[in-house]
Amino acid sequence: MSPELQPLMRRTTRRSALIGVVAIVAAGALAACGGNDKASTAADGTTAVTVLRSTGSTFEPLYIAEEQGFFKQAGLTVTIKAGAQDTSQNAPSVLNGEAQFAMTDSSGFLKAAAQKLPVRIVSNLQAATTKTAPSDGLLVKKGSSIKSYADLEGKTVGLSALGGTLQFICEYSTKQAGGDPSKIKFVALPLTSLNDAVLQGKVDAVYTFATFLDAGKAAGLTAIGIGTNALPGLSQALLFSSQSWLAKNAATAKKFTDAMSKAFDYANAHPEAVRAVDTKYTKLPADYIKNRSIQEFSAPIDTGVMQTVITDMVNFGLLKQAPDSNSILWSQAATTTNSQ
């Protein structure tokens, strides 16, 4: 293994752990201060809310709701802003009232909930499903001895970030294949360097997604498994808010989630609208936008899958403790137990 990969193994480095602790302490202090929990009114009399989106994608329904007038019909003026690159760091902005809603993924949210931050999921955005082709996955060199996730024992896997959903699904898939996830060495590398790392033999495999997955295949790498689709219902993107704001603004929150549900239906029926948002707001290559498989958007959170994720994240050491089951979902959030 090359020297630059040595320190970053299964868990975060001392520096990243310290940053995480500081962020959590700061968020806790902000929560104690209460923030501004009163919904503000825009100049036209509508209720003003701010949403922090991801910097990648999966935020398309937010812009569709704006463009199709679903927010306006609900009496809302919604400001959509790019949030933190690591969406798990959006919690402080929600807790201090800078934003009323923010995006993250299941692992990012559960880490906040496990630290007893007063945040609640209000809606899913997108979940893993067997209905569409995988948009993420494990890549190995052609001719590699790795033929299934079980073969990852004793191997080094490159990821763009440690401790998140991609590491979770890699460990989950290994466990499901009969392997021991604790015997995998995970290393963090720049997303743009992952494919080269496995091609050059610096790592045995990489877990990547979107256009980088396609580029890896085009470069001769072999995909193993079906990515996050191995756990249908796994929330890949969701929206959350603060418990205190929701308690005082339940009607506004319901208007927002209802408008988002309309946007989900519209996006699912009009994939060209999703591609248009990608073209305008992402840096994805034009060819990828034109040809990519667009996954279904949906509001319900699969509670059974969420419990599986919690249990396994604790077992894998990705969560120090399980969050209180009553501190995860907003009381009016849509749920399901029948993901496919």
Where do the language-model regions lie?
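N-terminal secretory signal peptides
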Residues: M1-R11, V21-A26
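N-terminal export leaders
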Residues: T13-L18, V198
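C-terminal motif of bacterial Sec signal peptides marking the signal peptidase cleavage site
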Residues: G28-A32
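Bacterial signal peptide processing site
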Residues: G34-D37
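Short, glycine-/small- and polar/acidic-enriched structural segments
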Residues: A42-Y172, Q176-A177, A188, D204, ...
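Pocket-lining segment of extracytoplasmic ligand-binding domains
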Residues: S107, V187, T192-V277
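Secondary-structure end/capping motifs
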Residues: A247-K320
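Conserved C-terminal helix/tail region of periplasmic/extracytoplasmic solute-binding proteins
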Residues: V314-Q340
